[in-house]
Swiss-Prot record:
Protein name: Multidrug resistance protein MdtK
One cellular component (GO) term of this entry: plasma membrane
Protein species of origin: Salmonella typhimurium (strain LT2 / SGSC1412 / ATCC 700720)
NCBIfam families in alphabetical order: matE
Topological domain spans for side Cytoplasmic: 1-15, 74-92, 148-159, 209-242, 297-313, 371-386, 439-457
Biological processes per GO annotation: response to antibiotic; sodium ion transport; xenobiotic transmembrane transport
A Pfam family of this chain: MatE
Compartments, record wording: Cell inner membrane
Length: 457
């Protein structure tokens, strides 16, 4: 019991800064929306449309680079810290290549925006302008993620938190300057949010790079002169590990986007109630997501030390803590669902629907916690390909079709409306949780030599 208690303390120490870093990141998006809305409703809508395209594109690159965390954690645990610098440099090369692809996609996103049904031309122009300003921040964001993953792989999660709040503090005044045109800068409205956010990502990267260069705990890692050439072998391995994670993230983001599109014809009340429940459940998701990041670090580190039993302890402790947290947040959601809905909207019909959907959200919080922590465990074991197959099967083969049938057809029961899609979420997330646990159990039953061999690749 003592080893589980000790492991829980380690996990909580790692996850709290990750939570706060995510809060800072979410707050930046909130600030952009509010400040653009203060300028005009059109500018706020433009930022919202632009963000809906930016997120899938940049999260694909973000997911690809998540492969660095277990690689660095494993090297750190095995005492091969001299190899970390080379891995990080290849991470920067990979981030640079991905940045070019993301920027090309975002530059041409105007074709997607202008093809939207009945979109106002002025709104479309502002959304395109916002994206074309924001895309210059893509390299800064991805370079920052490489540096952050280096720190987190070394079990140092506080720098990411500090840089997140630094970015938030810089974002507010720079937004103000470019939205309203102060200090000789042009008045750009919502497009100014894109300029400010792009600048903030570069500030965060430069600040994180400065920390890494001067941190005493990383002196032994700075052992290569010059930046070095791309290493095709290392980059191929990072892509093999990271691409399934990137695709899994992409499938998850696009699933919720597709459901939002399917709900939109059902009416204003249904759309508003769905959006309230989804926004609140997204806030609750920060808790298990941060724990999953901590579990990846601990499992990778323990495997690097050559201890498969300690890796199992880290995995089981993470699941136990995650389930306990999910039960608490589910009770909180059920108890206060009407009060929470009233914080978003005071329309009685919207509040009633949102409260009903939050009951379903409370049910899936436990499954959601298990599946995201399970994904973190599998990343720690460097078994990322299974994450892709599980996510695709659970969300797109089981969850979305069943949600569509329940919500919009009479094949099984009378049309359920938005609640049908939430039943689909429950089916998809529960399926993912079960499949993640089965895969974890299969991996942990393999001989230690095979587990350690995979982890060392």
């Amino acid at each position: 019991m003592q080893k589980y208690t000790s492991e829980a303390r380690q996990l909580l120490a790692l996850r709290i800064p990750v939570i706060l870093a995510q809060v800072a990141q979410t707050a930046m998006g909130f600030v952009d929306t509010v400040m653009a809305g203060g300028y005009s409703a059109t500018d706020m809508a433009a930022v919202a449309i632009g963000t809906s395209i930016w997120l899938p594109a940049i999260l694909f690159g973000h997911g690809l680079l998540l492969a660095l965390t277990p690689v660095i954690a494993q090297l750190n645990g095995s005492g091969r810290r001299e190899r970390i610098a080379h891995q990080v440099r290849q991470g920067f090369w990979l981030a640079g290549f991905v940045s070019v692809l993301v920027m090309i996609v975002l530059w041409n996103a105007g074709y997607i925006i202008r093809s939207m049904h009945n979109i106002d031309p002025a709104l479309a122009d502002k959304a395109v302008g916002y994206l074309r300003a924001l895309l210059w921040g893509a390299p800064g964001y991805l370079f920052f993620q490489v540096a952050r993953n280096q720190c987190e792989g070394l079990a140092k999660t506080k720098p990411g938190m500090v840089m997140g709040f630094l970015g938030l503090l810089v974002n507010i005044p720079v937004n103000y300057i470019f939205i309203y045109g102060h200090f000789g800068m042009p008045e750009l409205g919502g497009i100014g949010c894109g300029v400010a956010t792009a600048a903030v990502y570069w500030v965060m990267f430069i600040a994180m790079l400065s920390y890494i260069k001067h941190a005493r705990s990383m002196r032994d890692i700075r052992n290569e002169k010059g930046f070095g050439k791309p290493d095709s072998v290392v980059m191929k391995r990072l892509i093999q590990l990271g691409l399934p994670i990137a695709l899994a993230l992409f499938f998850e983001v696009t699933l919720f986007a597709v459901v939002a599109l399917l709900v939109s014809p059902l009416g204003i009340v249904d759309v508003a109630g769905h959006q309230i429940a989804l926004n609140f459940s997204s806030l609750m998701f920060v808790l298990p997501m941060s724990l999953a990041a901590a579990v990846t670090i601990r499992v990778g580190y323990r495997l690097g030390q050559g201890s498969t039993l300690d890796a199992q302890t880290a995995a089981r402790t993470g699941l136990g803590v995650g389930i306990c947290m999910a039960v608490v947040t589910a009770i909180f959601t059920v108890t206060l669902r009407k009060h929470i809905a009233l914080l978003y909207n005071d329309n009685p019909e919207v509040v009633a629907l949102a409260a009903q959907l939050m009951l379903l959200a409370a049910v899936y919080q436990i499954s959601d916690s298990i599946q995201v922590i399970g994904s973190g465990i599998l990343r720690g074991y460097k078994d990322t390909r299974s994450i892709f197959f599980i996510t695709f099967t659970a969300y797109w083969v089981l969850g979305l079709p069943s949600g569509y049938i329940l919500a919009l057809t009479d094949l099984v029961v009378d049309r359920m409306g938005p609640a049908g899609f939430w039943m689909g979420f429950i089916i998809g997330l529960t399926s993912a949780a079960v499949l993640m646990m089965l895969r974890m159990r299969y991996l942990q039953r393999q001989p230690s030599a095979i587990i350690l061999q995979r982890a060392a690749r």
